[in-house]
Amino acid sequence: TKPDAVLVAGSGTPAALPQKTLKERGYTGKYYQTHGVANSDFLRVGGKDVDDTYLPAGPVLVADQLPTSNPVRKTALAYVAAYEAAHGKGSVSTFGAHAWDAGLVIQAAATAAVKKAQPGTPAFRAELRNALEATKEVVGAHGIFNMSANDHNGLDQRARVMVKIVKGNWVYQP
């Protein structure tokens, strides 16, 4: 009846509501959320009630806090810089970084496929699929992609970091 921790398995700003309600009712245990809340609106809606919350997230969320030895840091920072140049400082979206990563993966695969077949042909589509499934060590903003015919996600442990919300900010937890 008095758990040590609560996992709110939600996404987006609505995931702040159960946590705010538990705080109002006096729950003082730990809070965990999912990567689905890794956006500035969650922080805005949750306010101080979401401080001290832990969540796993893509490394891009805390790119500037990653150790320089982290292989994703450079690409994640490049995404953040490009996104914020277009949309303003502090506007970065982890969700947009998934699209960025997809672009990097398809660019690498298309570069390989075009060497084997003419674009627009069935042969090219087959080569593109083969190249996608042969993707190795493509560094994105969320992780490093290594795909196969059986793994179309291609991400491993390097694709997530633990983050804590501290005073309304995302803080990397090594």
Regions found by a protein language model. Give the residues of each.
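Extracytosolic ligand-binding ectodomains
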Residues: 1-174
